[in-house]
């Protein structure tokens, strides 16, 4: 047939001879290693999976097994670290809440914020100013002094000066004492300490002003009082306790106010209940007139004339000057006698 190659036996043998001469001999094949059979009760090695070859989707080769174990332990440690961090955060939050509740307060440090605690409220000094001002001088309290009858507080110098011509509280108008209002006032050192802490440099400025005041006048600067040790009660005489304030020598003028009558048209008025009054010698006739107008409820158109002996007194004259000028003729049992009368004001007549 055409197109079919005819191979003879001789050609086949020649080809084999040529191929055997051209190809190298194959390497020797080592016999397979024999695995000893497991003894009774022992398990043999696990058979390898057919799909365990490298590059397959089966199990990893033996050399990658330590990495898989290390990754498992690393993941377990990371989970434990996260749990510890969460527990620490919860403990910190609880501690912060406890600190917030324990430190809940109002700081009065001149408006300065020491921490960022939201529950602490800062108060401006202007909100506290009405409580640390003296209503007489309109300044900050210096030597804060409180009236025991009404608990209103003023500067010591202001309230002592006020009591020279009045026995009433300048704030509520209550009678502090009929004759000696200085008996019913006390120093308030706690309030004064608060004022010094609230107002920066107030204490230093006050000390400097006091030092300059005494130095300009050539006087010795008074030293702060130092508490003395209490001596033993045995063998010591009893001492009379002195008042916190000494009664000024000016408060030694006792008055006897005598009513001599009123003209027609003076209007209605109340009689004076108490005609014995003790005031400062520096008080003027104008102060006495104001006292009479307030006590008697006089009409503004009513004029008050005050007479001592045969002298019609002027409003600017002080009681000490009147006593010195008139002498013993103005005195009766140690009292300065003043006569007063009510007349119609000349402005009303015209």
UniProtKB/Swiss-Prot annotation:
One of its GO terms (molecular function) is zinc ion binding. Ubiquitous. The modification Phosphoserine is found at residues 30, 115. There is a cross-link at residues 223, 234 (Glycyl lysine isopeptide (Lys-Gly) (interchain with G-Cter in SUMO2)). SUPFAM superfamilies: RING/U-box, Ubiquitin-like. Residues 23-35 have a biased composition (Pro residues). Residues 1-115 are annotated as: Disordered. One of its GO terms (biological process) is regulation of transcription by RNA polymerase II. The gene is PCGF6. Changing residue 59 to A: Does not abolish phosphorylation. Residues 72-110 form a coiled coil. This is Polycomb group RING finger protein 6. Residues 1-22, 36-48 have a biased composition (Low complexity). It holds the Pfam family zf-C3HC4_2. It comes from Homo sapiens (Human).
């Amino acid at each position: 047939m055409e197109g079919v190659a005819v191979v003879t036996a001789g050609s086949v043998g020649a080809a084999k001879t040529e191929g055997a001469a051209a190809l190298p001999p194959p390497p020797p094949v080592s016999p397979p290693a024999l695995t000893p059979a497991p003894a009774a009760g022992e398990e043999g090695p696990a058979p390898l999976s057919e799909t365990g070859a490298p590059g397959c989707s089966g199990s990893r080769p033996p050399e990658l097994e330590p990495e898989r174990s290390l990754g498992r332990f690393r993941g377990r440690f990371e989970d434990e670290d996260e749990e510890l961090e969460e527990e620490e955060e919860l403990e910190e939050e609880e501690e912060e809440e406890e600190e917030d509740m324990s430190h809940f307060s109002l700081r009065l440090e001149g408006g300065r914020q020491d921490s960022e605690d939201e529950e602490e409220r800062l108060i401006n000094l202007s909100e506290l100013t009405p409580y640390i001002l003296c209503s007489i001088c309109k300044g900050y309290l210096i030597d804060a002094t409180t009236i025991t009858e009404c608990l209103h507080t003023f500067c010591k110098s202001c309230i002592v000066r006020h009591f020279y011509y009045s026995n009433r509280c300048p704030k509520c108008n209550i009678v502090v004492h009929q004759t000696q209002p200085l008996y019913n006032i006390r120093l308030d050192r706690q309030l004064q300490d608060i004022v010094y802490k609230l107002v920066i440099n107030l204490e230093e400025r006050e000390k400097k002003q006091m030092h300059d005041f005494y130095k300009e006048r050539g006087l010795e600067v008074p030293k702060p009082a130092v508490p003395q040790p209490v001596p033993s009660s045995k063998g010591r005489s009893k001492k009379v306790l002195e008042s916190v304030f000494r009664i000024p020598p000016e408060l030694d003028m006792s008055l006897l106010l005598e009513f001599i009558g009123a003209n027609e048209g003076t209007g209605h008025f109340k009689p004076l209940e108490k005609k014995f009054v003790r005031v400062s010698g520096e008080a003027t006739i104008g102060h006495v007139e104001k006292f009479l107008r307030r006590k008697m409820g006089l009409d503004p158109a009513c004029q008050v004339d005050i007479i001592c002996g045969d002298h019609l007194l002027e409003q600017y004259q002080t009681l000490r000057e009147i006593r010195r000028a008139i002498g013993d003729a103005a005195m009766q049992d140690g009292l300065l006698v003043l006569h007063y009368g009510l007349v119609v004001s000349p402005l009303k007549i015209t």
